[in-house]
A protein has these predicted regions:
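C-terminal functional module detector
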Residues: 34-90, 94, 101-145, 149-151, ...
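Cap/lid and interdomain-hinge subdomains that line or gate substrate/regulatory clefts
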Residues: 165-171, 186-194, 227, 249-276
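N-terminal secretory signal peptides that target proteins for export/translocation
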Residues: 1-18
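Long, charge-dense tracts
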Residues: 233-234
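Extracytoplasmic ligand/sensor domains, especially the bilobed periplasmic-binding protein
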Residues: 213
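Aromatic- and acidic-residue-enriched carbohydrate-binding clefts of CAZyme catalytic domains
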Residues: 145-181
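Bacterial N-terminal signal peptides
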Residues: 20-30
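Conserved, charged catalytic cores of large soluble enzymes
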Residues: 238, 248-253, 335
């Protein structure tokens, strides 16, 4: 049986030699047996935890409240973050997330203007915490020449740190990590200790009703440099989480193997897990490809598994937006947001991007393909909601444009960071100005607890923003009337479904309708407009349309139904803007004028703010920078994307 397991591990791309796979199985079996022996103690500990939580007074909101957080955050535990100069620990990150002031990697003090409601620290599973031991000169690790060289580079300056921040992900992508990092005999004991420290820190800062510290990690699959990463988020506490070690891409780069691990975790512990893919925009066309990583066409079994384990998709983060692309959505004048520098290749630039790849990298096209799969074999692999996140590797939970803290410690606030070359390969360069100060995950839940927030994510009652706190409600139904806007929550939940929901089988004579309410970030820009993005299949053809459904001012639709620009108040000389245009709130009850009850469709809402400065403009003003690249965005329209509501005729 052990032989079959190891052969299977090899077959599915674990990249681990046979003797290591055997050792890995033995060690994991040993851990499992140890945990079984502690079942009674763990059960008592869990009971104590439940009793303790029950004594805490948690405010509940029956009609749900929006909670703001980050579902993608790295600290010094991640190898590429540590190699790039990050020394912020999970404890540092939690302290900043709850509003404390902390000196960061560059010695500058950071304090959030508004604390987070929740944080998922998602350090890379691959060598979890092991790179700290490389820095410490761990005797066993120093027997490897690559580890010794990295140890010396870690003692260098900024140039070495920038090189390591690129070299470590590349080593993972091309199976060139130091042997002790991939050898379970050396790696697992270090990872297990680091993981238990990580879960203990999460328990320390998790305060039900006040702040939620999720236990999470990132599975970092990057075959030949194509980004297929997933963030795995547990609903559970340390008692359950400590029964595992995070599943990594060193065991398998196949997401189906990750899902199998998640299923085994739930069966073993009674816990719950979900995964959030990200950066389809740099996946080399693999994120939503028509073939699995093993080369098989998608089928119903695959679709049902993916839909079960991956209810959300990260549409926005530091490495750009993955909603759509101008070459795919040619009639969408706002499709060019967050693409600068990211549509030229995959994560590592080992493979340059082609138009064919783009068809399988973005959320909107995945939604359309999902309708096609559902029609073909009765299941939709891409029935996911949308969220935003940061993917910061500094350990600093930053989101505001004028407080952008960089991707890595090497580009924390400093004059030259916008024009620095952060990656160069195959004749293509990526510059610092390609990074975006993003994003947020907003979740609707009855309370700020792990269980409530996780359940909100699972049911897709969540949305993403580019880093602004736009408050957005979306309900779909067939029985709404204008008066319902005055009681949108009661009417929305009572007569329809919220974002992430399903509507089926419209009654003859009734049109699908959506109640939408958007409120500006109180600390930022007014709202320009609300749009509904619709996709459907008609006579075998994939169709999409963007409708302007509510907007500020007295603008009128043109002959094509388009609304003119809202204007621009940004002063490029000092980085200021005013809210003399736009509106603080927009509401609408919108009926789809093209609704056909016989055609399946999806609808999601996009809310645009008025133009505002980017972090690049703030840097330009702050540091007196005279020259930036022509394609460096100085002004942008920040936005929010709701999770879709799906309509099915059956």
């Amino acid at each position: 049986m052990l032989i079959r397991f190891c052969n299977r591990l090899q077959k599915h791309g674990a990249g681990i030699p046979f003797r290591y796979a055997t050792t890995l199985f033995a060690l994991l079996l040993s851990i499992s047996c140890q945990e079984t022996a502690k079942t009674r103690d763990d059960a008592m500990e869990a009971a104590d935890s439940v009793a303790e939580t029950a004594e805490i007074e948690v405010t509940r909101y029956p009609l749900k409240k929006v909670f703001w957080g980050d579902t993608h955050h790295h600290t010094a535990i991640s190898g590429d973050a540590f190699g790039g100069g990050t020394r912020m620990t999970p404890e540092d990150s939690y302290r900043m997330a709850i509003g404390e002031a902390v000196k960061t990697n560059s010695g500058q003090e950071f304090k959030m203007r508004r604390p987070l409601d929740f944080l998922c620290i998602t350090d890379h599973a691959e060598g979890f915490g092991v790179f700290i031991e490389i820095d410490r000169g761990n005797e066993i690790l120093m027997q490897d020449s690559i580890a010794r060289r990295w140890n010396q580079m870690l003692k260098g300056g900024k140039e070495e740190a920038m090189q390591l921040a690129v070299e470590i992900p590349s080593a993972l992508a091309n199976n060139r990590l130091p042997e002790p990092v991939t050898n379970p005999e050396t790696a697992i004991p270090l990872m297990q200790a680091s993981w238990k420290d990580h879960t203990a820190t999460a328990e320390k800062y998790n305060k039900p009703g006040e702040f939620t510290a999720f236990i999470a990690w990132e599975w970092t699959s990057v075959p030949t440099g194509n980004n297929l990463h997933r963030n795995v988020i547990l609903r559970d506490d340390k008692t359950r989480a400590d029964q595992i070690i995070p599943f990594s891409a060193l065991q398998s780069e196949d997401a189906e193997k990750l899902w199998e691990f998640m299923e085994s975790y739930e069966a073993k512990t009674g816990g719950k897990a979900l995964a959030i893919p990200h950066n389809g925009n740099i996946s080399g066309g693999l994120m939503f490809a028509p073939l699995t990583i093993s080369g098989e066409p998608l089928n119903r079994e695959y679709a049902e598994a993916r839909s079960r384990w991956e209810p959300l998709f990260e549409v926005m983060q530091i490495k750009g937006a993955s909603e759509t692309h101008p070459s795919l959505s040619t009639e969408d004048e706002f499709a060019d947001f967050g693409i600068q520098g990211w549509d030229n290749g995959n994560l590592t630039l080992d493979i340059l991007q082609t138009p064919e790849q783009r068809k399988y990298q973005y959320a909107r096209q995945a939604y359309l393909n999902g309708l096609e799969y559902e029609e073909r074999f009765g299941a939709n692999p891409y029935k996911f909601g949308l969220v935003g996140a940061s993917d910061t590797h500094t350990g600093v939970p930053h989101h505001d444009e004028d407080m952008f803290w960089g991707k890595h410690a090497t580009n924390e606030p400093m004059p030259e960071r916008a024009m620095e070359v952060v990656k160069k390969l195959n004749g293509v360069s990526r510059y610092g100005y390609g990074y975006t100060s993003a994003g947020y995950t907003a979740v609707y839940a009855e309370a700020n607890t792990r269980a409530d927030l996780w359940d909100g994510m699972k049911r897709k009652e969540a949305y993403g923003t580019s880093g602004t706190r736009i408050e957005l409600r979306v309900f779909g139904g067939f029985d709404f009337v204008t008066e319902d806007l005055g009681t949108i929550l009661e009417s929305g939940y009572g007569k329809g479904v919220p974002m992430g929901g399903d509507l089926k089988d419209a009654v003859a004579g009734k049109r699908i309708a959506f109640m939408i309410h958007a409120k500006k970030d109180p600390n930022w820009a007014n709202l320009d407009r609300i749009q509904v993005v619709k996709g459907w299949l008609e006579n075998g053809k994939k169709m999409e349309k963007v409708y302007d459904v509510a907007w500020s001012g007295d603008r009128k639709p043109d002959a094509k139904g388009k609304i003119a620009s809202v204007g621009n108040t940004v002063d490029l000389t000092d980085g200021s803007f005013t809210n003399t245009i736009g509106e603080p709130e927009l509401s609408v009850l919108w009926y789809d004028p093209d609704f056909d009850p016989e055609l399946a469709a999806f609808y999601y809402v996009r809310v645009l703010e008025i133009p505002s400065p980017t972090w690049i403009l703030y840097d330009k003003v702050k540091y007196g920078i005279s020259d930036v690249a022509d394609d460096a965005p100085l002004v942008q329209q920040e936005r929010a994307w709701s999770s879709p509501i799906w309509y099915s005729p059956r």
